[in-house]
């Protein structure tokens, strides 16, 4: 996939979320089952002895803040109850993050930045990455849920995961979900309809499906025939290659992350998302 086509896919998704922020947020209310196991693993690794220090959570592509709301409730009922909490969210769509029906108003010590995440990462030189990419302190827990499937090409997915690792303190936890939607026959049909429609009415100038890589698809939205989202379906080998790619970026030869867990969760099947839990070295 060439850079221009990747940029067009990113803009396609940015436009989708700007135009459909309210309707999308309305369908994203309940916490994902996989988040509970994610937090259980994270809390096993975080030392409760430093309770006077803030516990910081960083969320890349935070959407309507429903993970922050879940994490606040989960942390408040854990051994970290009473510990100062700080939440840092980054997203390219402020309308989604501050949606009136969302959770932003409920979260204390919430710091939100509107950032074109992929546009920012595409401009950086992978050989000369800054220590941190986003304006936030190093986090105890860094997460990225429901976003990696919107990142075109393996090159940029590695950059996203690398940026997430850099935003995490040594010993901190990094959690990512990978959407495996093509294992769902309903989603297979939905993608087929959207891609057939795109052949007749291209979603943007220069649309060329031959640029797609294995696992790349277009998906529509509700009954809006003009709405498209670029999404990537992951398999386990691609996820392994992604984690390996982040390790390859290390400048001192040490692996910047180690894998703690990998599991399926969510959806009617319980296998809609593949979660990977890493620990920063």
Tell me the role of every PLM-derived stretch.
Residues 143:
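A conserved beta-strand element that flanks and buttresses the S-adenosyl-L-methionine
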Residues 151-163:
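A short, conserved alpha-helix within the catalytic core of class I
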């Amino acid at each position: 996939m060439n850079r221009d086509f990747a940029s067009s896919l990113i803009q396609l998704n940015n436009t989708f979320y700007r135009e459909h922020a309210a309707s999308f947020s309305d369908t994203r209310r309940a916490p994902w089952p996989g988040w509970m196991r994610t937090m259980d693993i994270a809390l096993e690794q975080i030392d409760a002895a430093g309770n006077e220090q803030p516990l910081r959570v960083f969320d890349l592509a935070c959407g309507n803040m429903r993970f922050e709301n879940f994490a606040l409730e989960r942390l408040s009922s854990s051994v970290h109850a009473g510990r100062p909490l700080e939440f840092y969210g980054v997203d390219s769509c402020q309308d989604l993050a501050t949606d009136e029906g969302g959770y932003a108003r409920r979260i204390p010590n919430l710091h939100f930045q509107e950032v074109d995440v992929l546009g920012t990462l595409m401009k950086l030189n992978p050989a000369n990455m800054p220590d941190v990419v986003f304006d936030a302190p190093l986090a105890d827990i860094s997460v990225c849920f429901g976003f990696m499937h919107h990142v075109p090409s393996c090159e940029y997915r590695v950059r996203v995961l690398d940026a997430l690792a850099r935003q995490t303190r040594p010993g901190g936890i990094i959690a990512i979900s990978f959407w495996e939607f093509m294992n769902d026959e309903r989603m297979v049909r939905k993608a087929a309809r959207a891609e057939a429609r795109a052949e007749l009415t291209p979603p943007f100038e220069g649309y060329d499906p031959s640029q797609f890589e294995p696992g790349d698809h277009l998906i529509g939205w509700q009954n809006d025939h003009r709405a498209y989202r670029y999404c990537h379906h992951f398999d386990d080998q691609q996820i392994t290659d992604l984690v390996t790619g982040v390790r390859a970026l290390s400048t001192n030869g040490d692996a910047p992350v180690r894998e703690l867990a990998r599991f399926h969760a969510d959806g009617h099947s319980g296998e809609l998302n593949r979660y990977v839990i890493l620990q920063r070295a």
